[in-house]
Amino acid sequence: MRYSNVIDFSICMSIKSENTFLLENPKFIKNLKFFNIHSSQEPKSPTDIRNSVENSDFNVQLENKLKNSFKQDGKQKSKKKKILSVDLDQEHIFKKKNKSKVIISAPDDLTNNSEGSFKSGKQKKKEKGKHKQNVNKDIHHTKNNRLSNLDPLDDINKDKSVIIDSSLSIEELSIKLKIPPAEIITGLFLKGISVTVNQIIDIAIATQVAQKYNFTVINQNQNNQSELDQSDKLQQVSTITSINRAPIVTILGHVDHGKTTLLDAIRNTNAAGKEIGGITQSIKAYEVNWPYNSSNQKLIFIDTPGHEAFSSMRLRCAQITDIVILIIAADDGLKPQTIEAINYISSKKTPFIVAINKIDKANLNLIRVREELATYNIISTDWGGEIQFIEISALQKRNISQLLTAICSLAEFINLKADPTELVQGSILEAYLDKTKGIVVNIIVLSGTLHIGDIIVSGHSYGRVKKIINSLGNELIQAGPSSILEVLGFYSIPQTGRYFQVVNSEKEAKKMIAQIPLSGITQTTKNILNLNPKVYNHNLNTRSLNLIIKADTQGTIDAIINSFIQISQKKIKLNILTASLGVVSNTDLDLAFSTQALIIAFNINISTNILNAAEKLNLSLRKFVLIYDLVDYVTYSMLDLVDPEYDKILIGQAEVQTTFTINKGTVAGCIVKSGKLKKDALIGVYRKNKLIYEGVINSLKRMKNDVNEVVIGNECGILSKDYHFWQSEDLIKAYELHEKAKTL
């Protein structure tokens, strides 16, 4: 018996489809890796094998049939060979379990019944006709798959449906769609939406992700378009009564790159100097008039927070903006929120201007900033690109007029229109509860004219407009398109970021609200962390920190939640009991007392009565005005609940010389061999290199005197209350415990 160095195809080619494969792939034989196979036959060369296969009656007949099939389908056999040879290097040889034959298979064959499935003779005869018709279709389909950029999961999930009826996290969406979270995150990032695996996204974004993978999203209100669809609709106004409207300009960029300072320079104010902590924590909108082409051009500016916690606020503003000012600090370059803005601008194809700020600083490398932007295909006009770059100093108000003129020029080019005669549509920038005014809603009118007495609807909230106040603080009777307004009259607090519209009557408003399913309401932050057990409840024994959040605006609550989601919760789970607008009430105190929760008040005042009541109940009630401080406080509170861990540090060794007994127990008379021994130190006793006891030095004496420590070369007596079995020559190792830095 001997071993040959070629495959015995009389064994491995046991069914006809393998012969077909070899006939149509002559290069495959040459590329085979030959293994030592137990055989009694004479060795055959690759040429002999190929000739044997090609000249078989079956393959001669099959070749003729394939030629005819190719002619019917308008294909040539040579084209088929070319296509099939693409993946020769990807073919795999494997042995089928419990079988004495080698099966040759390509990845595409594993799911292709006509080319790679193994069937009985009867089944083969039944499908022989089908095989002839489908050969070219399968080959053509394979080619298209290789050339297309569609996700390979598209075909798997084709024609499937998924229920998305509420906001959910990326991880929950991944489970629903059976798509890796990293893939969803990458896809959203390319669209300018930065998210993490634990971050909550609304129905509109989740629906877009599902539809990308050919899912049919069900159980939503079919009468309402997605937020993005509505946005597109609002911008596309062209009627006989249309007029030019002012552009909505949003300033985007990294925290502390000068967004608010730029607006101060434009408005001749000092809002940046008045901001707590020097950062913007809410959306601010302003109207500015600038002389352009012999007339005053009205510009609407929106200032957005740059801190990462306020990503949802930035997204809301970017959805309604016409022109983006991408501001970049010349001394800092591109940063995470800058890149987030670039990705969003790119995905939405929003017109934009680059403002390179802080050129008043010394030793700047402006070329470096331009080169960084060029990597994102943002090239200035003086470098041969299409984007206007304006170098400014917001602090010194340099080149501000040049920037404003560039904005007016771009607005003129994109030719924005709105119809003031139609029913009002717009977007809610912010909503909050004021102690004296009641429910206050900041809006921007995108089309139509808003009047006192109009019935206004947004999501599940509606009301009758009682008061309209413009950005200058003046009361108005009506306001047209591209107006920043403060509106009073809503009966309940609407969801920020939602679109609103005016309807003809309260009856119509109630009818619209009734058509919206309760599950379709956009993200409710109350109990948001608790609604995601898949994300947070990894360990049922994990300790929890209960929180009650009270804030001034819905946007602030969203930012707080986003910040908390970024905190690791492997050891301690955040449990948000309530998150609502308004002042701290006695009801909040009662809930905190029964659940031992921390009460957090952000940007709201706390009455003296509430403070006194909280103190009597020994409750933790803290007020914050900076999100940095709030996140630090919650993080430290979580760390307090983490059990301490220690490092054992060897501080000395001693050897037992003798032992004697006293009333309190057995004393070991020792001599310190290295380092020192300390009272209350942790010790380990070793006998013949084997650990026999671990405990604590309860008493340490030298010359009958109690001491706190004994250093090298000195004799001492050691007493451990729970150990009495000392022996001469026992080795004692003394340790100090150093607490490790706690982590979450």
Swiss-Prot record:
Residues 121-134 have a biased composition (Basic residues). Residues 357-360 are annotated as: G4. Residues 113-146 are annotated as: Disordered. InterPro entries: EF-G-like_DII (IPR053905), IF2_II (IPR044145), IF2_N (IPR006847), P-loop_NTPase (IPR027417), Small_GTP-bd (IPR005225), T_Tr_GTP-bd_dom (IPR000795), TF_IF2_bacterial-like (IPR000178), TIF_IF2 (IPR015760). GTP binds at residues 253-260, 303-307, 357-360. Residues 303-306 are annotated as: G3. The keyword Ribonucleoprotein does not apply. GO terms for molecular function: GTP binding; GTPase activity; translation initiation factor activity. One of its GO terms (cellular component) is chloroplast. It is found in: Plastid, Chloroplast. Keywords: Chloroplast, GTP-binding, Initiation factor, Nucleotide-binding, Plastid, Protein biosynthesis. One of the essential components for the initiation of protein synthesis. Protects formylmethionyl-tRNA from spontaneous hydrolysis and promotes its binding to the 30S ribosomal subunits. Also involved in the hydrolysis of GTP during the formation of the 70S ribosomal complex. This is Translation initiation factor IF-2, chloroplastic. It comes from Gracilaria tenuistipitata var. liui (Red alga).
